């Protein structure tokens, strides 16, 4: 019976590539890669000549079936690798693993680097339990709601963030959960590696003052403070967009001005427009 190997690769420093990972990638018949161009550079660095096929976010369902069918038909072993770190952890790969397991193929881990574990290990925080949330919503109000939900569900949270959005994330945390302790690791194992630690407002300030703050991807660890977390009964129930538009009308605003007010708060344009249509229907 064939085997699917889930192979962790370096998150930046090639010295972290394990001998077992090298041997596995050399010995399988095919490597399913998130981006074949990125993985090809890694293979070239270790003189590995195994054929590659793409298996990424946009094609993984169709490709997973094709790969599994070929594994069974030709009785070949396959490895899955992403651009960096461990597949399936906020990265492609889980669809292929699920498809293989459903077909009776054994999935075997070849462990190695992962940004999440690396960031936790240098956080300086006590880690008895944590929750990994991957990437968070971009829209401001959705992000704030998600942060409060995370704080209620976990003592310690780990997230990924891009260098261009990390300041917005820290600012949102500082606004709704200001006593949060943060460990923000940037560009782990690479040239501009740096970890900032402290209360979220201080980490935000240091990030804003750091000219190299946008040089690499971030993995952040948040330790919430109970003082910031509203009890479920105390948590405010936000008004619907429709109700907020009616509130604006009651304050003497035109519907257009009430819509503009919501858009200025960061609400989504299509959602505000849909709410305005419902308001017009009720006023007709």
Label the model's feature ranges:
Residues 1-58:
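Glycine-rich, flexible N-terminal cofactor/catalytic loop recognition
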Residues 156, 163-284:
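A contiguous loop/helix-start segment that scaffolds small-molecule binding in enzyme catalytic cores
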